[in-house]
Amino acid sequence: MATMLKLLALTLAISESAIGAVMHPPGNSHPGTHMGTTNNTHCGADFCTWWHDSGEINTQTPVQPGNVRQSHKYSVQVSLAGTNNFHDSFVYESIPRNGNGRIYAPTDPPNSNTLDSSVDDGISIEPSIGLNMAWSQFEYSHDVDVKILATDGSSLGSPSDVVIRPVSISYAISQSDDGGIVIRVPADANGRKFSVEFKTDLYTFLSDGNEYVTSGGSVVGVEPTNALVIFASPFLPSGMIPHMTPDNTQTMTPGPINNGDWGAKSILYFPPGVYWMNQDQSGNSGKLGSNHIRLNSNTYWVYLAPGAYVKGAIEYFTKQNFYATGHGILSGENYVYQANAGDNYIAVKSDSTSLRMWWHNNLGGGQTWYCVGPTINAPPFNTMDFNGNSGISSQISDYKQVGAFFFQTDGPEIYPNSVVHDVFWHVNDDAIKIYYSGASVSRATIWKCHNDPIIQMGWTSRDISGVTIDTLNVIHTRYIKSETVVPSAIIGASPFYASGMSPDSRKSISMTVSNVVCEGLCPSLFRITPLQNYKNFVVKNVAFPDGLQTNSIGTGESIIPAASGLTMGLNISNWTVGGQKVTMENFQANSLGQFNIDGSYWGEWQIS
């Protein structure tokens, strides 16, 4: 009988995970308290929303371990298009440093200024201006209407006051009788991911060329103070939902995660609910952010159900293909900046042991990582690295990243022959890391802070071919400085990371980048330190509709210096700045294209 009851419970849990988690919608609230629990969600084959009854509105400090930070500004509801029958969708929120302040060790709170002043964590003015990022996510298969309301009951203005980014994708926007904004979201097998921005809620970032300033300086970016992103995801394909049984699945219980709770079965399943790492590696309970999940080598699949919110990070040890699927959330909010898993998770950078949200350090070769659906929040460092064998590839789609305010918070490594599509990444480091051949990236939306380029292909000499990047929407940038080491550019290549190295004329990079839109005042198109040849490097259909930066800081200028013995085979076509086409007549550094390429390359490149 006990076995039958367990099987029934697991079956019910699996059924719920397959269609989404139905949780609790909002009642009355005020900052620092939980929301109410009146149920008005919906989960069906048309669309599925969910709720957390442990939502905590708190814009200043860490939330309680079992709570989820909830937007102080917005509520979101979803209806089947045209029916005006709206259901609640939880609105999450992320704040810079997660309310911890500048801390050095996870054991430091409630002290909040223990990180040495010499350490730049990438966050400066953001907390003082109240910058935050909210998001709501749901599953859908039909056209839906998404209503956005202000939590204080005030009007969000007229549709003309709303900008939806990427602007290259248009939406019908209307105003509701209760002061909200309604957006019609068409059914899309690839889903829709977009930022909803209100003209009355924009912050203009000013820089003096060294740091953000509150007066004077030059405009380097404009962002919402209270950002809101909508993730409308397709239901998971059946092949990305594991076949779970009591024998092959370790089903987690919402609440604290103690060492070993994740078991040794093939599948690790997180049903709807909130989870947090409760113990350090020695089994001591207490301070948060002192451990991560080190999976058993038997475990190859992590499934995060819609409504699962896991405060932690995942490290794989399997030798077979491995998976991270489901529309749940993996949050690094309890970790300090650059959390060093090899040194008690303190804020000391290590390229080898600082924590990744997704990690594998013992690859067996010939493996593929499948990542479909998850959202990661507040990463403390690089977000994904797999080490130990070069025979690794990835298949990544419907993958979202938010709250990446710290430095070093990049996009995932894109390994050989990887396929990445329909992603939305908020980053403060390299967004699209092109270090290997055969990769394909399509329909990527990037929200960039101020560190490193959108596309990175430097740090060492590389032999790369067969790479395509298509339909790239850069919806925000706010570079503080004109940089070439950490390029302030759309397409960048940093100089050597290691010392004592020289460019390699035997190697070359070849790729095609197409259909790029950069919104707002854009940084340079290129900042390349040549470490090898560039051969048949095609960039086509690039639009900077709002123009290039023309400030005295110089962030709008593309820079490609000379490199002895190397060639620069660039072919740029249909590049427009403010609607005007860049050509061989107006590309110059003091003209429309601000394209400063060394004269030694003349005849090797062209703009048409």
Swiss-Prot record:
Q: Does the keyword Secreted apply?
A: yes
Looking at its record, which EC class is this enzyme?
hydrolase
Q: Which GO terms describe its molecular function?
A: dextranase activity
Provide the reaction this enzyme catalyses. Endohydrolysis of (1->6)-alpha-D-glucosidic linkages in dextran
The secretion signal range is 1-19
- The protein's name is Dextranase
What lineage is on file? Eukaryota, Fungi, Dikarya, Ascomycota, Pezizomycotina
Compartments it resides in? Secreted
Q: Can you supply one Gene Ontology CC term for this chain's record?
A: extracellular region
Q: What is its EC number?
A: 3.2.1.11
UniProt lists the gene as DEX
Please report the propeptide residues according to the UniProt annotation: 20-34
A single Pfam family it belongs to is IPU_b_solenoid
Where on the tree of life does the source sit, at the highest rank? Eukaryota
Q: Which residues bear sugar attachments?
A: N39, N571, N574
The alphabetized UniProt keywords are: Glycoprotein, Glycosidase, Hydrolase, Secreted, Signal
Q: How is it modified after translation?
A: N-glycosylated.
Q: Which family does it belong to?
A: Belongs to the glycosyl hydrolase 49 family.
